[in-house]
Amino acid sequence: MPMLNAQQFLNQFSLEAPLDESLYPIIRDICQEVKVHGDKALKMYNLTFDHTKTDHLEISHEQIKAAFDTLDEKTKQALQQSYERIKAYQESIKQTNQQLEESVECYEIYHPLESVGIYVPGGKASYPSTVLMTATLAQVAGVENIVVVTPPQPNGVSQEVLAACYITQVDQVFQVGGAQSIAALTYGTETIPKVDKIVGPGNQFVAYAKKYLFGQVGIDQIAGPTEIALIIDETADLDAIVYDVFAQAEHDELARTYAISEDAQVLKDLESRIAKALPNVDRYDIVSKSIANQHYLIHASNFDEACHVMNTIAPEHASIQTVNPQPYIEKVKYVGALFIGHYSPEVIGDYVAGPSHVLPTNRTARFTNGLSVNDFLTRNTVIHLSKDTFEQIADSAQHIAHVEALYNHQQSILIRQS
């Protein structure tokens, strides 16, 4: 972990393409197979990729309710608190139709999407938080049909995931994962309904399938490895910062972590504490590789330079742990989510804070945002002009149409003026 000054870091900073282009033919073939053969293809891929035989793709409502009913009380309460906070936050930011004066002639109205598919990762871990951070938003938006897909497991889908589906009132849950599940949600099969939009994180196969099928179905984003950048000073609790770094690193060997400070000694102390804690860290194989290859210590000469580095990285998660964090809130502009102070660690945002943890990665925070309830709404503009308003603006409209040589456009105006 060599320390770099800000300019050295910026000179070498680059992000590799988040997706492996060699996967394209594989994804194309999987999608075509699902499009043609439907459920038969899904069951074949469950056996091939997930080593699980699935006679029935859909998990019954009785199984979903039983998972909730038999869940231990502490887990049930934790999931419920997370749900309530997410729901309250999303309700507070939801775009709503306003009561307008009759004189208002141009305005917007919002409608919930009809159907949404949610991808919940599986594999070695269970992610009920992904259900909460996506399905709750769709529920608050008023989406009519919420469908969850998640990879099958030999011992069945995680009970915690099913319990989260029960809490968020998901309509259907299917045990199918990977690119094949994205294709199923896009095209529809005998049992899985076609949806209007697909959200939720996944591996490269899932991300590439979403990219490949975008246009036939809406998507939230093309997600890459997780990342965090922290701006810290001498007042930061470095032992806590160590675990803020490890928390991101344990997700993925490609997870990126950045520590930025105007105080070089703070960075040296952090490096020493990371080195001391690393040998005994949980998930050592993953964390150690991430730290070795994707961890950066960046010495900024002043406040403006620290903010410039942060905005250039445009990380999924940004954490400000300094004596006076307030100035950073206005200056740090391009991040997925901004966590301020010692008691707002990024991990609290993963689970219970309220905003969704589905956030832009790979510098896409420079032009897009984290998932919210409003991503499950359509926005329609309404134009309802009076005769007086039409007469005031018609000449300009027909003249612009004439300039563009679109004479039928022009005639559409002129015929109303006559």
From Swiss-Prot:
Binding site for Zn(2+): 248, 251, 350, 409
Active-site positions on this chain: 316 (proton acceptor), 317 (proton acceptor)
Binding positions for NAD(+) per the UniProt entry: 119, 180, 203
Pathway this chain belongs to: Amino-acid biosynthesis; L-histidine biosynthesis; L-histidine from 5-phospho-alpha-D-ribose 1-diphosphate: step 9/9
Entry binding sites for substrate: 226, 248, 251, 317, 350, 404, 409
Lyase as UniProt keyword: no
Assigned protein family: Belongs to the histidinol dehydrogenase family.
Protein's recorded name: Histidinol dehydrogenase
